[in-house]
Amino acid sequence: MSPEIIDSSDRYSLKPLVGSLLSKIDELLDQNKALLARIAELEAKLGTPPKTPDNSSLPPSKGQKANTTEPATGKKQRRKGHPGVARALCPNPDATRDIFAVRCACGVPVLPADQVLAHAYDHVDLPPIKPVTTRINLHRAQCPCCNKTVTAKPPTDMAPGSPFGPGIVSIAAYLHGCQMVSYNRLVEVFDGLLGLKISEGAIANMLARLAKPFAVVADKIAAIVRNSPVIASDETSARVCGKTWWQWLFASASAVYHTIVPTRGKCVPVEFLGGIRPKVWISDRLAAQCTHAEAHQFCLAHLIRDAQYAIDAGDDIFAPGFKAFLQKACVIGRKRADLADATIAGHARTLKRELDRLLDLVPKQLDGRRLRDAIEVTARDKLLVFLTRRDVEPTNNVSERGLRPSVIFRKVTNGFRSGWGAAVYADLCSIVATGRIHHRSPLASIRAAIAV
């Protein structure tokens, strides 16, 4: 509005104009206040430390790589020696060849009865790999009594349908699920290494038929884990049909169960437990992992990284002492096998007093204050459960190690194109991981599951 219009207006016409201008000023002041708050928030973010593998769950592969140091240009230092290591002799060789000396260098013959063992070594080789094809001929005849046709039944170990036996199926499942070999490369491996012509479709059909026997074994594994007193759990993302799903792991001392589902919510462990309440649950601080057991042990390794992030952000009151407290607790946890119960109880009392002292501190830095408040509210009774039971670990490394192959599988294969593929892979992970606990090779575990 031009000044001339304002000068020519009387006071009655200016009153609504002034009111609208005051309203506009209030609106602009509110907008300015919101923008200033947003600027302060962004400036605060600029001052936060970057996420690294040491202060967050960022994997080491995504961390900053330090430059390698140039080798010193002088006299090369001698490497410290170490005892030599040789392959041990096989305790049960498949065959033995006794080689006797024939004659001395002077020409005199040497009798075998006069010779003693001078040296023994193993020669290991593979026989020629060739598929064995068995033709099944089912015969029939007319019953001489009732004149009905009687046809021979096929053998149970060589049923009609797919021509490929459990040896081929187990190798395909192992190479694809454990070694991340694609269907295309599996065709080349079977042809070039095993001398077997097979198509990608046949491989897919093989794996699809494994759904039923694998599910039977996986259900038994789930029951073992479900009824265990101590359960560790973790989850990682999975790609199914182009969408983000979640692979959950539930581990006990004698079995490991995997499942791939569309959600990361609390409904997954609730459905898995089916009303059973274990003694102790080990996990990170994810809300979906809480309130499933009588006691809960938080992973101290996760909390050490959280404390390190608060230290990097500038907290020098709570986070440094809390990190030292967690590291001391982990050291005691690793030494429990050599400690008496009374000694462990003494360490528990000392650590509880130290935790009380730390929680009485009042950090001024925002991240340190958030960490301290979170520990005070949700984690105070979930840090030292491992000192009350020897079968409880202070960290959840068993779950992270169990999910690591699945993370590599996801990166190599880019996920699953079908729901049944994800289900078969989860059951395969359960079978292989449980077999390793009982000192069985992955291939042996797969073959045993197929035979069910």
Which residues does each PLM region occupy?
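Short, flexible loop/hinge motifs at secondary-structure junctions
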Residues: M1-S162, A232-S233, S283
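Catalytic center-proximal scaffold of phosphoryl-transfer enzymes
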Residues: R11, I136-V452
